[in-house]
Amino acid sequence: MALLGTRGKSKAAARGRRHTRLRKKIVGTELRPRLVVTRSARHVFVQVVDDAQGRTLASASTMEADLRGFDGDKTAKARKVGELVAERAKSAGVEAVVFDRGGSQYAGRVAAVAEGAREGGLNL
């Protein structure tokens, strides 16, 4: 894993420090994989990762064709992505996950993904 500017004072450096601190504590297993949220200025990407095998079990993002036509703000789209990844994870046999916010603050779109995943039936 690349360290993202751990020595600077910028927002990106602070996010990198938070991410490395989180990854020391959060590990996805086969029974409880990691729900990884990656956020850009425009899109949200979510993956369910089993760290023991190094495999992605399910994924969803706002760049998918069925979500591009979805009306609403970025937070509403993020909630929809959470519901979609929960549906795909359940079809892959995953019931519970560990939430990895990726160094981002648990607010806004990141929190909306978690709420959508809970509504979709995943246990966070």
UniProtKB/Swiss-Prot annotation:
Family in the record: Belongs to the universal ribosomal protein uL18 family.
Source species, domain of life: Bacteria
Keywords (A to Z) from UniProt: Ribonucleoprotein, Ribosomal protein, RNA-binding, rRNA-binding
PANTHER family the UniProt entry points to: 39S RIBOSOMAL PROTEIN L18, MITOCHONDRIAL (PTHR12899), LARGE RIBOSOMAL SUBUNIT PROTEIN UL18M (PTHR12899:SF3)
GO BP, sorted A to Z: translation
UniProt-listed SUPFAM superfamilies: Translational machinery components
Record has tRNA-binding as a keyword: no
Molecular function as annotated in GO: 5S rRNA binding; structural constituent of ribosome
Gene3D superfamilies per UniProt: 3.30.420.100
Subunit relationships: Part of the 50S ribosomal subunit; part of the 5S rRNA/L5/L18/L25 subcomplex. Contacts the 5S and 23S rRNAs.
GO cellular component: cytosolic large ribosomal subunit
Record function comment: This is one of the proteins that bind and probably mediate the attachment of the 5S RNA into the large ribosomal subunit, where it forms part of the central protuberance.
InterPro entries: Ribosomal_uL18_bac-type, Ribosomal_uL18_bac/euk
The protein's name in its UniProt record: Large ribosomal subunit protein uL18
